Amino acid sequence: MEKRQFTRAARCAACCALSVVLAASLGGCAAASAASSSDAASVSDVAVASAVNGTAAADDLGAYDLEYSKRDLDASYDATQATYIALADGASSAETYTHGSADGVSVSGNDVTITQAGTYVLSGSLTDGCVFVNIDEEEKCQLVLNGVSISNGDGPCIYVTAADKTFITLADGTENTLVDGADYVLDEDEEPTATIFSKDDLTLNGTGALNITGNYRHAVRSKDDLIITGGTYVISAVEDALNGKDCLKICGGAFDITCGEDALKSSNDSEEGRGFVAIDGGDFTISAGDNT
């Protein structure tokens, strides 16, 4: 196992996978640490980033959005305004804080679909089911995982089909588990490739724990920004562990990652200011088939 520690450096942009350990911080949540190898890495107390095709000079960083929003960092929510979803095979239900009927949630078999912006607190379990988010593309949704176990043999466990941004919050003191299947059954116009898949911006935060198994391809994949500011993660994936097409930004959390390809990846190389990985904090143990 290779272990490297850094005390000071400049943060760089990453065009694709995290393959060379480089940087420290220019802001964000906190200074963190990182190291990587194709076998394993254990890291603490430094911020890192890298580029497959070279590293960006400090003068070039202006094109990159390296900041975290207040809501990215704040995992709190108003419990009195939330909708509570109890997951159960064939019997999932939703209610308000005062136990009234809840709008914005539909149930079909083992699938639960959220259709309105707001905060949704999920608990319970689904076997061969999925939680969908399909809201207005200019609105936001917060999913609070409060002791959730979801498995889906032929698709993702959480699938954001439409939203401006979705926040997945890990409730304090809870352990949550998501496991997808090795083969997806998809309609012609569908494209999920991960246990948690979002077509739009996605943030993971909170202080709870999340175990993610990506048997099909990836564990977490966003087609826009993927941001993580807290939580404890045990991740296993056939291909990539954490994949944000436009960017991957992490400023906190503990990560135990085993994957067949890249642990941390961003792949948009066609737009200026996109396709970078920025690490501003966190504790990482990584075993990756590719160069992380």
Briefly describe each language-model feature range.
Residues 2, 11-292:
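A composition-driven surface/loop motif
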